[in-house]
Amino acid sequence: MNNQLQETRWSENVILVDADYVDKVTFSLIVNFERMLGRRIPQADLARWIDCVALDGGLREGAHETLVVLVHQKDKARLENFAPSDYANELDGKAFKDHLGEFLISAIPIEAIADGEDYFSEALKLAVAQKEIRRIMVIPNAEDPYIYNKVRETLNRVDDDEKRITVFAMEPKPGGNFRQEILGYSLMAALGISSEEISSKS
């Protein structure tokens, strides 16, 4: 387990993100929607996406504190399809405030892909074990059955009715001891794509 996460000061709300996976999905959405809508799609607004995930996870307006943990491969210095994007210089240790409260960002590099697969579920285990955490939003690589099943197993062992846990994926997945939300909606909002614009082109 990465020492950086072991020493983390947890917040009442936590968003745990496989950042490499979300970046890849965002690239696919940009390519597909540029073709469909016939216009350039700008990089996704990271703060807007985080807000949308928080809302989908049940957070409402107020003076909340939310920790956003971006897990990424060590050889990836930045998100390619979001702004701001540089893990070390623009994201790690930074924060922003809006109507949903304060969001604290922690970017955690992982050495190898195999380590990353298990690291994500280990990070999730650590998060669900924290008594002070009331709300957890999880964005794993749900397209990988191994990773998704590890996430499900971890969450199905959580014996805390006070925790509201939401897992985000691009399509509905086998359920468990958690709520589910579709990841694509928050990413579309962050990319400035509305359902009305899609309807007008179909």
Regions found by a protein language model. Name each.
Residues 97-202:
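Nuclease catalytic cores that cleave nucleic-acid phosphodiester bonds
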Residues 2-108:
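Domain-level signal for Mg2+-assisted phosphodiester chemistry and nucleotide/NA-binding surfaces
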